């Protein structure tokens, strides 16, 4: 029977949970705002963890400023993580901004705009959607 998940995937899931707790309860920095960990990728040797984050920015905060502030906490976060997990080696944590949500929303808006434009043009020309299928 083969393993359903590799060790790296299991460690990745554990790190995601622990890092979420650490960022929520331990890291006190108003420049960061609300952080969501969308994914954690761990190297095969478990030495490095690439942590994908998104931010809910308030006021003048931007994802770039929030990420810069969060990167200042990489070493202390790694130390806190080492105390919480029982591994021989605590992975080196690297925070990366995850723009997939923003890009997905942008693409969805573009598709909606195109559909609305097509409907408007069809209405202006006096055609209906059922006329389209008959051609």
Curated annotation (Swiss-Prot):
Q: Which UniProt keyword terms apply here? A: Cytoplasm, Ribosome biogenesis
Does Cytoplasm show up as a keyword for this record? yes
List GO terms (cellular component aspect): cytosol
What Pfam family does this protein match (any one)?
A: RBFA
Q: Does the keyword Cytoplasm apply?
A: yes
Cite the InterPro entries for this sequence: KH_dom-like_a/b, RbfA, RbfA_dom_sf
Provide the primary localization: cytoplasm
Q: Where in the cell is it found?
A: Cytoplasm
Per its record, what are the GO molecular function terms? ribosomal small subunit binding
Annotated signal sequence range: none
**SUPFAM superfamilies from the entry?**
Ribosome-binding factor A, RbfA
- Which GO terms fall under biological process for this protein? maturation of SSU-rRNA
The family assignment reads: Belongs to the RbfA family.
Whom does it interact with, and what assembly results? Monomer. Binds 30S ribosomal subunits, but not 50S ribosomal subunits or 70S ribosomes.
Task: Name the job this protein performs.
Answer: One of several proteins that assist in the late maturation steps of the functional core of the 30S ribosomal subunit. Associates with free 30S ribosomal subunits (but not with 30S subunits that are part of 70S ribosomes or polysomes). Required for efficient processing of 16S rRNA. May interact with the 5'-terminal helix region of 16S rRNA.
Q: What is this protein called?
A: Ribosome-binding factor A
């Amino acid at each position: 029977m083969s393993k359903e998940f590799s060790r790296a995937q299991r460690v990745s899931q554990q790190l995601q949970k622990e890092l979420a707790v650490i960022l929520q309860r331990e890291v006190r920095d108003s420049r960061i705002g609300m952080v969501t960990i969308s994914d954690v990728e761990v190297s095969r040797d478990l030495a490095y963890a690439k942590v994908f984050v998104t931010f809910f920015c308030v006021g003048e905060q931007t994802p770039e400023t929030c990420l810069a502030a969060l990167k200042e906490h990489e070493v202390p976060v790694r130390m806190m993580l080492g105390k919480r997990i029982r591994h021989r080696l605590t992975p080196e944590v690297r925070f990366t901004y995850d723009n997939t949500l923003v890009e997905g929303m942008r693409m969805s808006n573009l598709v909606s705009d195109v559909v609305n434009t097509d409907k408007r043009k069809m209405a202006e020309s006096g055609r209906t959607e059922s006329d389209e299928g008959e051609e």
